Amino acid sequence: MSLYCGIACRRKFFWCYRLLSTYVTKTRYLFELKEDDDACKKAQQTGAFYLFHSLAPLLQTSAHQYLAPRHSLLELERLLGKFGQDAQRIEDSVLIGCSEQQEAWFALDLGLDSSFSISASLHKPEMETELKGSFIELRKALFQLNARDASLLSTAQALLRWHDAHQFCSRSGQPTKKNVAGSKRVCPSNNIIYYPQMAPVAITLVSDGTRCLLARQSSFPKGMYSALAGFCDIGESVEETIRREVAEEVGLEVESLQYYASQHWPFPSGSLMIACHATVKPGQTEIQVNLRELETAAWFSHDEVATALKRKGPYTQQQNGTFPFWLPPKLAISHQLIKEWVEKQTCSSLPA
């Protein structure tokens, strides 16, 4: 028995080492592509490209979900030539990742203004016909993508949007130039370097010990509730942001909080969602909704939330004029935050 356990442990260590080694190799390869323009250009030769049009990714429908097709450099050059575009437009692409086999992945938007083409935007309908797909708004398609494509396209859209918004130096007013990977932009007149940034957002599930507080904004789909969320102000820690947001939005004071996880979110322009659990002071649970921030907020029981987690929205209006209570889809960190609370409540209610 001890011999078997020893072999099993060694095998586990071996596979963990291989996983770590693959991750380190992949990470350092991406670092090299970001730092070395020549290496990145070489990677484009054997890489694959995800296409966008005005920040909407090219998608194809398959078995009740969307797939994000990839195109080789040769296919992309042929496509650009067919639509009268210079292949130099490929220099607008940005690096978004790579496979374990070091196939580099890039994203290129064919609908945004380009410094390499007079007629910058390619016509969307003709492109969709040629590519046998559709350019679909990412917000609408995100939850019908697999996890890998959702992550890659979210990264791509945020990077493409950032580059489109930072084509000029804020100090000199002169055009900035991106490196091949798109990991930075430089102003040639003063050498100021601009790096893509994300805005930190604290998303918090508030609990009073037995219930959790969920809210909705007027922009949410009908019937959907989620955890409280707000941008970090300059000078604030995450903890201070959470306490302020809870006080501002629902008039409650946080007693304790615990970090859960984080997630990149491409909307509205690239955010880092920092998810936490928070507990309010006992006996101080009366909600005072700030209508400038929220449409409504309410306490929900464990059973109500557990049932809502099983629903898939959005829903149509019921005969009585209401919409069923549902929660954000699984890919959203708010869903995972709420799910963990339900699981913890379930475990704590079980007999010892």
From Swiss-Prot:
Matching InterPro entries: NADH_PPase-like_N, NudC-like_C, NUDIX_hydrolase-like_dom_sf, NUDIX_hydrolase_CS, NUDIX_hydrolase_dom, Znr_NADH_PPase
One of the GO BP terms on file: NADP catabolic process
Transit peptide, residues from-to: 1-20
Alphabetical UniProt keywords: Hydrolase, Magnesium, Manganese, Metal-binding, Mitochondrion, NAD, NADP, Transit peptide
Enzyme Commission identifier(s): 3.6.1.22
Catalytic activity: NADH + H2O = reduced beta-nicotinamide D-ribonucleotide + AMP + 2 H(+); NAD(+) + H2O = beta-nicotinamide D-ribonucleotide + AMP + 2 H(+); NADPH + H2O = reduced beta-nicotinamide D-ribonucleotide + adenosine 2',5'-bisphosphate + 2 H(+)
Protein's recorded name: NAD(P)H pyrophosphatase NUDT13, mitochondrial
Lineage: Eukaryota, Metazoa, Chordata, Craniata, Vertebrata
